[in-house]
Amino acid sequence: MSPIDAYLHTVIMEAATEARRQGSATIEAQHLLLAVAAQEGTAPQRVLASAGLDYQAVLAALDREFDHSLSAVGVSRAAFNLPRPSMPSKRPPDIGATGKLALERAFASAPRKKDLRPAHVLLGILQAEVGTVPRALALAGVDRADLLNRVRDAIAGDGVE
């Protein structure tokens, strides 16, 4: 298994765990972002950390986005005693629409599969213009354009990883 295949496998398996932990039947872009942030010592994790986005910060940003989205329709999570999400099933979650789009953007950002690097996965996630991830980053005060530039710089300077 090539290094990129191993990285993709690890990220997708971790994203599946995140999706199940949140009670989601599908792996979405936010689960991929959490999985990338959890991969200590990798180029994408270092780029996120350089922007103040370690795993816990990404998780907090996604929680804020959830609360903000609920408040947009006049609902407060604090007003209800909600149970923890249940694990949907033993079957691994499928990759959902935003997860597929993020991976498609990642693959499209490299000229050939042999040129694909872990940072391309992060690039594919961050290139979304709408959705949970860009809303969460905006609420966290992250300059998405700057973060995208950092990822592109990491790709340009990364001949091996």
Segments and roles (model prediction):
Residues 1-161:
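Histone-fold recognition with a strong bias for associated Lys/Arg-rich disordered tails
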